[in-house]
Amino acid sequence: MFKFITLFVFLLSTYVLADEKINGIYIGEIEDKYKNTYPVTTNLEITDAGVIKGQYEYKYGGKNWNGIFYDGKFSGKDLLIYWKEESRQGWLAINFDEKYASFSGTWGSTNNNGNWSGKK
């Protein structure tokens, strides 16, 4: 019984600590479906209530664009989160490295529109 409780506490603490490790600002690139890249700042956070949200900002066509992340679902080192800016919205699916210091993944609105990366 003691081994079971110890294992449960270890797994629970690992899950909670992993969640907290994604909090922060990541500097990276967005790549569109034409392989053009744009610098992006991605800010992710998990609230005390366990809600995963954030903001992002990038420059395209001489204009600064920004949006929000909402309704994130975290599983292991994978995060699926939704984004919205002005009249557009879509999804971002990323995978974190072992230390949660960087990520890479894909994004889109209906289909895969390109890649998205970031590093603390």
Identify what each model region corresponds to.
Residues L7, L17-A18:
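Intrinsically disordered and other compositionally biased segments
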Residues M1-F8:
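Sec-dependent signal peptide recognition
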